[in-house]
Amino acid sequence: MDAIKKKMQAMKIEKDTALDRADAAKEKVRQMTDKLERIEEELRDTQKKMMQTENDLNKAQEDLAVANTNLEDKEKKVQKAEAEVPPLNRRMTLLEEELERAEERLKIATDKLEKATHTADESDRVRKVMENRSFQDEERANTVESQLKEAQLLAEEADRKYDEVARKLAMVEADLERAEERAEAGENKIVELEEELRVVGNNLKFLEVSEEKALQREDSYEEQIRTVSARLKEAETRAEFAERSVQKLQKEVDRLEDELVHEKGRYKNISEELDQTFQELFGY
């Protein structure tokens, strides 16, 4: 009887131990499953970060390409503006030369007008003298009258030429004024272009700094990609190790479950034997 009780106690202890081992195995499987899920979540986050890093790098490259295109356009505008300056300078030189020639022609016409005016005054004086002498010499009077008419014609011609010269001078002055306006506009354009060139230079310096920063960011991205790749490889290794561990644990759980079934069978057999023994004892 004591042997049977000891055997029953031993079987109960063995059964409890098996159940505890099975529970421990299940808990370990659950922990490994949770750990594997965390590893998979970390792997997904790493992949998202890698995609974001690639997108940032592509955007930086696109921004750099746009900046280079804008810089080329600015350089073309500056070159075009610089090409417009020499023709304006040549035009100003031609207008100045034309103005000098017009002033010279005006001086000549003015001298002729002064001479004609002097001749007319002299003729008028002579005419008055002749009138005071009561036209004593008709022939001389006619001569003087002819000279007077000629002088008047010369004066009219001088007036006409003076008007023509004045008109041409006004035209030249208007052309000169327009040329000065164009020259002033050209100078303003040059100032604007110089300012734009300065801005372009500053933008170029900024782009060079931005390009250097972009290269640094690219190096940083490459370093991050290498780090992420290493972490990914490490995560894959850990995942493979975890998978192998899970497989081993699963095998251990299966073994423990089989052992538990076996122990339950043994416990059932022992219980049946005990029942039969009790029946025999009580029957005895």
Swiss-Prot record:
Task: Indicate whether Coiled coil appears among the record's keywords.
Answer: yes
Q: Which residues form a coiled coil?
A: 1-284
Q: Which UniProt keywords apply?
A: Coiled coil, Repeat
**Gene3D superfamilies in UniProt:** 1.20.5.170, 1.20.5.340
Which InterPro entries did the record assign? Tropomyosin
Q: State where composition is biased (Basic and acidic residues).
A: 113-142
Q: Which domain of life is it from?
A: Eukaryota
Q: Which family does it belong to?
A: Belongs to the tropomyosin family.
Q: What does this protein do?
A: Tropomyosin, in association with the troponin complex, plays a central role in the calcium dependent regulation of muscle contraction.
For this protein, the record's PANTHER family field holds: TROPOMYOSIN
Comment, domains:
The molecule is in a coiled coil structure that is formed by 2 polypeptide chains. The sequence exhibits a prominent seven-residues periodicity.
Q: This protein is called what?
A: Tropomyosin
Source organism per UniProt? Acanthocheilonema viteae (Filarial nematode worm)
